[in-house]
From Swiss-Prot:
Function statement: Component of the cytochrome b6-f complex, which mediates electron transfer between photosystem II (PSII) and photosystem I (PSI), cyclic electron flow around PSI, and state transitions. PetG is required for either the stability or assembly of the cytochrome b6-f complex.
Cellular component GO terms, alphabetical: chloroplast thylakoid membrane; cytochrome b6f complex
Organism in which the protein naturally occurs: Cycas taitungensis (Prince sago)
Gene coding for it: petG
Entry's localization field: Plastid, Chloroplast thylakoid membrane
Protein's recorded name: Cytochrome b6-f complex subunit 5
One of the GO biological process terms: cytochrome complex assembly
Length: 37
């Protein structure tokens, strides 16, 4: 049980981190698009 908690936290953080970086990259892309007008 003690080892299941950290692995569960890591497995929970991986999708959150990847989704967050994807959203950040998308927002930066959109911002660059608007500046290029």
């Amino acid at each position: 049980m003690i080892e299941a908690l950290p692995s569960g936290i890591v497995l929970g953080l991986i999708p959150i981190t990847s989704a967050g970086s994807s959203v950040t990259a998308y927002l930066q892309y959109r911002r660059g698009d608007q500046l290029d007008i």
